[in-house]
């Protein structure tokens, strides 16, 4: 089973990405396609919710993971997709679907806007994908409507063995380039279950909670 982690370097500059790539240059085996990510925060407008229920919900769209969108609310996750190819043909045939699905974010911002209000959109476009020995490192600069937010690093390994050591290696390179203030998450959504895309989305939430 694979493992993943997310590192967010808030006190970075847009040039930090290039500096980290240069620090990794001797370990890079190949460079893959660019990637992008959308991270949205929604706030529930319903009043009088129980004190132990958060009003925040997060939407993470992984354009590099089959364009799947994962909703994270408290410790629960839901995986959605807006890809027409993922709709069962039977639903189109019997009229249950038009075959042109709306994204969950479109539904939240239109049909459910009286319940969920988007507070923030953070985007990362044209990120770098670096292949190292047993580790995929994805780097992207994040921006919001207010400007540059920081550097995000997504780590993925096919094998769980020595994954913490690999994370420590990346953190060591961050220290080399004097990027010392960062947040790392390799948490799982649930200790007794494992779903790679849901765990990855949860790690984004844990790392990007601002």
Swiss-Prot record:
Keyword tags: Activator, Nucleus, Transcription, Transcription regulation
Enumerate the Gene3D superfamilies for this protein: 3.30.310.180
> Where does this polypeptide localize?
Nucleus
Any single GO BP term = negative regulation of ribosomal protein gene transcription by RNA polymerase II
Q: What does this protein do?
A: Component of the Mediator complex, a coactivator involved in the regulated transcription of nearly all RNA polymerase II-dependent genes. Mediator functions as a bridge to convey information from gene-specific regulatory proteins to the basal RNA polymerase II transcription machinery. The Mediator complex, having a compact conformation in its free form, is recruited to promoters by direct interactions with regulatory proteins and serves for the assembly of a functional preinitiation complex with RNA polymerase II and the general transcription factors.
Q: How does it assemble?
A: Component of the Mediator complex, which is composed of at least 21 subunits that form three structurally distinct submodules. The Mediator head module contains MED6, MED8, MED11, SRB4/MED17, SRB5/MED18, ROX3/MED19, SRB2/MED20 and SRB6/MED22, the middle module contains MED1, MED4, NUT1/MED5, MED7, CSE2/MED9, NUT2/MED10, SRB7/MED21 and SOH1/MED31, and the tail module contains MED2, PGD1/MED3, RGR1/MED14, GAL11/MED15 and SIN4/MED16. The head and the middle modules interact directly with RNA polymerase II, whereas the elongated tail module interacts with gene-specific regulatory proteins.
Q: What is the protein name given in its UniProt record?
A: Mediator of RNA polymerase II transcription subunit 20
Q: Upper lineage ranks?
A: Eukaryota, Fungi, Dikarya, Ascomycota, Saccharomycotina
